[in-house]
């Protein structure tokens, strides 16, 4: 690649150097832009960036000028190095020829002297090296701070120059040259001081050692001279300087000299082993420059890089001390080896240095990759977080816009919803209250009707007491029997009251004391009574308007479980007007009644069963339904141990038939067939055989006596006939026979009977009139 001024280089090398040059300038520009962003508006910084990128032509021109000057200087340096190498080769050959014939005694003496002074030299050398290390570290810190200050100044100046699109100033180049020259001067001074101190220590040990060290020190000024020449050269950028040194080391590796001697080869091998552990001064310089370059490239990692460089410096100093001690012990052998061993050692030390440089570069690359990956992960996490926040912000913005656009409608809608909920709750409460009121009203109505019926019934129920007995010949205890009971006013005609009660209440007394609910009393007269139905009618007169006629119901329509009220006067006047409540527990009951108290039942009373409380004094009281109408008259209760609330009432329809005859006739005319009979159940076996009764007959009656010219005699009944059916109904006993006959008291029709006579079954008609 022809770059002008009669210089030709490979194209790949040209591109590499151009990239390095542009990289350095871009890095400086980026630093300047980073500082400008803190002080200048975004608009100004963007304009400056555009102007910088437009100045690509000027960059190429500056690069070509810099590269051409660098190549000229390199050619001069190469020529000078060749001259110096030829001169040094001649000197080394003469020194080798002069020292080749030294005896082994010199080496033995040198080894003994070295063993004596080994400990003292180590301590002194360690102190000297530690002081030199501290001085180098301090100078490095000062130089780094100076470089940072200079870079900041450059950034400011570069920012000013970016607006005018000018080239970098000469002041920056001079400061760079001064910093690099000061660094190289400090390194060369440290090397000369170390060599002088080593030479002074060698003079104290022995004269022979002083001669060897003096010969060795003669070579040191050459190094310093070369360093001075390098310092006088025009400074290059850091990457270029590093590459130049690598090329020089490679040139040194190609220089080999053959001096045929097995002993010399063994000594050179020993020296080479030591040289593997000996870091060179140029290695230190390269490391320092590399560290400075890394610090400049990445200002954010200055602290970490400096700490790593300090650790490497300490490790290298320790290795130097150890290797220098061994080097002093084998100084004679190393000098007798000659230039061949020196060149081989330098070759191996150069390889070691290159390996250490490569390892250091790999370590820095790994650290850089690790940091880069960590930064990338952090950037990804930050970007995800920012995206999430942006999404949330977008949602919030959308909601805000929606609210700003439609908030009046939303407020109205919410108000309507709240109003609907409130109205619904109000209507539900109103309906609930209405239902509760309806239920309460229904309950109140029901309760009021019940109470009304009870109060009306109480006005129609009276207390009945017999005053005197008509038959004065009866014993007092018998005359006082059933003295108090209850009665019901079933009809009122003006001031005349017709009261129905039980026959066993009035007894055989004609006059009865009637007491009303208002405690007024009158005397009533018994119009008629019937012991077979246990009913009686009393007539009384009263102008008291509070006494009411009771309403009459229909007992043919009774329902099992129908609620009823019982009103009467239990235990006399003191508890008059007592009301008890119950239900109809049974219908069509046949209740046996003992009227004359001879412990023998006289009649089957047709009644319905109630469970309301009935006590002595309730006989003749009223049983009303839920409408307050009379459906029955209390007649009896079962008074037996362990029996409760089993009472019976005569149906009102039967009562009406009886009281009608009692009002007009004063008695009830029942048909009398003129027979006496026994129950089959009471017959013994002899009596059953006498009447030739079949074994299958279990119930019925046996005619025991027939009146002459009576209805039974006229009908053809004979003594010994067994009657099992009457009027199409099974006949259980004589009470049932009387009940069936009395049930036809009104029509007096003939009824059919099934009988057994002489063991044969037959039917006959019994006349009732």
Curated annotation (Swiss-Prot):
- Point to the regions of Basic residues compositional bias: 1-20
Pfam families annotated for this entry?
PDZ_2, Trypsin_2
Q: Name the InterPro entries for this protein.
A: Chloro_Bact_Ser_Proteases, PDZ, PDZ_sf, Peptidase_S1_PA, Peptidase_S1_PA_chymotrypsin, Peptidase_S1C
This entry's Enzyme Commission designation comes to 3.4.21.-
Instruction: Please provide, alphabetically and separated by semicolons, the GO molecular function terms listed in this UniProt record.
Output: serine-type endopeptidase activity
Superkingdom: Bacteria
**Which residues does UniProt mark as catalytic?**
504, 534, 619
Query: What family is it from?
Result: Belongs to the peptidase S1C family.
- Spell out the Basic and acidic residues composition-biased ranges: 21-64, 71-108, 138-186, 264-287, 348-364
* UniProt-recorded name of the protein: Serine protease HtrA-like
Keyword Transmembrane among UniProt keywords: yes
Organism of provenance: Staphylococcus aureus (strain N315)
